[in-house]
């Protein structure tokens, strides 16, 4: 696409929450090497692109290894996650400012341009500093010959704010609403369409809010251990109790590692807590002695279920197909304060080829492997890593696991089918297909069982769907199924 040479202008940048302020030390002098926060953000973006790394795992490790703390750590974090969230929008603007197609650029150059575009369009970093530090970074990672090109492209980006760029680079919302929203909120078009379908009739008024909420910076949410100290006894200063889970609280800031190390709490989104609570409180017929977490790694829900099972006098069996993830579950349960909790067994096994007899369990939690499109606030790269063509294989695995979960549950017992995706192909379509082909299975009213949480009914009203824009949680889907024979 030919370069768009607009006159230099001023104006506000993208609306919403601003990035961190920065001092004059961010105003890099020409010729200086790449500064540590920007180099670290670049290294994470490159690893996400080239090695399928996860930013939420790699960034904390690099910050610790490089001794980056305080304001510099905040800058590296903002640049990493902000660039990943806004990548689709920034690419549209960069394409209008470049005389070379973006897919013909060397990957290091493209990543530097994206970092620069994020600073120019969505943070308070001064334009001259954003351009100068990006040129320094380009020299460091791609050599001196690209510096002129990077400088020219980013100077063109800086001629307008994001609100002024959008009408130039996005489709007309009057004729292509989904295309406009895809560029405006930085999503692949197919995810915009999938969210529209998942919201059903509510999409007319809520789709834009749902997409915007997927770009929010989430606060850290934790769960106290049932049977251990009450959350009010362990909440640090500034923390707030969650609205609906009696175990959850959100941190005002800081590192949750100290609380995690004590075993009294673990990081867990409130929607994930509600999924475990839904299984534990769903009515069953007969005994209530043995619970199964069928895809338990890395252990967040298993830990909460362990405490809930202990309070009910039940035993938990936690399973994951991968031994290293089963080891994470063992570690999570071993750190929990035992208090009233019952015992637990953790095994590595494939839920599709179970190591237990049919009908062995009273309650079964199945948190299936999924696209992760309900957790984009925490893992923004998932939107660029997944494609619509991935869904049929995922749905096939999900159906197989759900059939196995129903077989593991005794008559009168309950299965919770949970995904961190709102996409119909992974949620209501999977459940309705499996239930229709599995005699002796009925669908319970999940929203009624989660009655403390408002506005969770999905377009299929017997299923519960939480949303970031409604509940400030991940977009978790919950279906509750009972075996009748």
For each feature predicted by the language model, list its residue ranges.
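S-adenosylmethionine
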Residues: 1-485
């Amino acid at each position: 696409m030919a370069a768009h040479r607009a006159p230099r202008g001023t104006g506000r940048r993208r609306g919403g929450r601003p990035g961190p302020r920065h001092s004059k030390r961010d105003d890099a002098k020409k010729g200086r090497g790449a500064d540590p926060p920007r180099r670290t953000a670049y290294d994470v973006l490159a690893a996400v692109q080239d090695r399928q790394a996860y930013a939420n795992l790699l960034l904390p490790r690099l910050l610790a290894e490089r001794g980056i703390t305080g304001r510099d750590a905040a800058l590296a974090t903002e640049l990493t996650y902000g660039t990943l969230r806004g990548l689709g929008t920034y690419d549209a603007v960069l394409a209008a400012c470049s005389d070379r197609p973006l897919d013909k650029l060397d990957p290091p150059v493209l990543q530097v341009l994206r970092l620069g575009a994020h600073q120019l369009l969505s943070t308070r970093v001064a334009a001259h500093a954003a351009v100068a530090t990006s040129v320094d970074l380009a020299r460091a990672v791609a050599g001196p010959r690209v510096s002129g090109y990077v400088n020219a492209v980013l100077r063109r980006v800086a001629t307008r704010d994001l609100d002024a760029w959008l009408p130039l680079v996005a489709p007309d919302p009057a004729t292509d609403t989904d295309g406009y929203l895809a560029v405006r909120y930085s999503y692949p078009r197919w995810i915009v369409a999938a969210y529209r379908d998942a919201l059903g009739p509510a999409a007319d008024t809520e789709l834009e809010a749902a997409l915007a909420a997927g770009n929010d910076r989430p606060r850290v949410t934790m769960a106290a251990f049932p049977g251990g100290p009450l959350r009010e006894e362990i909440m640090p200063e500034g923390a707030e109790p969650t609205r609906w889970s009696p175990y959850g609280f959100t941190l005002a800031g800081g590192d949750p590692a100290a609380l995690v190390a004590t075993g009294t709490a673990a990081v867990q989104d409130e929607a994930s807590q509600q999924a475990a609570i839904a299984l534990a409180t769903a009515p069953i017929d007969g005994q209530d002695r043995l619970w199964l977490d069928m895809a338990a790694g890395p252990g967040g829900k298993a830990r909460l279920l362990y405490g809930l099972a202990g309070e009910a006098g039940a035993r938990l069996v936690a399973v994951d197909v991968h031994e290293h993830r089963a080891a994470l579950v063992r570690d999570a349960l071993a750190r929990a304060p035992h208090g009233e909790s019952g015992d637990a067994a953790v095994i590595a096994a494939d839920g599709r080829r179970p190591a237990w007899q049919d009908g062995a369990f009273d309650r079964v939690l199945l948190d299936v492997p999924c696209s992760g499109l309900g957790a984009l606030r925490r893992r923004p790269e998932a939107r660029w890593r997944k494609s619509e063509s991935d869904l049929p294989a995922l749905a096939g695995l999900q159906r197989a696991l759900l059939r196995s979960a129903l077989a593991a549950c005794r008559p009168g017992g309950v299965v919770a089918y949970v995904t961190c995706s709102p996409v119909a192909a992974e949620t209501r379509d999977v459940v309705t297909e499996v239930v229709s082909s599995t005699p002796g299975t009925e669908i319970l009213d999940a929203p009624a069982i989660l009655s403390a949480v408002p506005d969770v009914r999905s377009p299929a009203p017997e299923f519960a769907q939480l949303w970031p824009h409604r509940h400030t949680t991940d977009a978790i889907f919950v279906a509750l199924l009972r075996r009748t024979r």
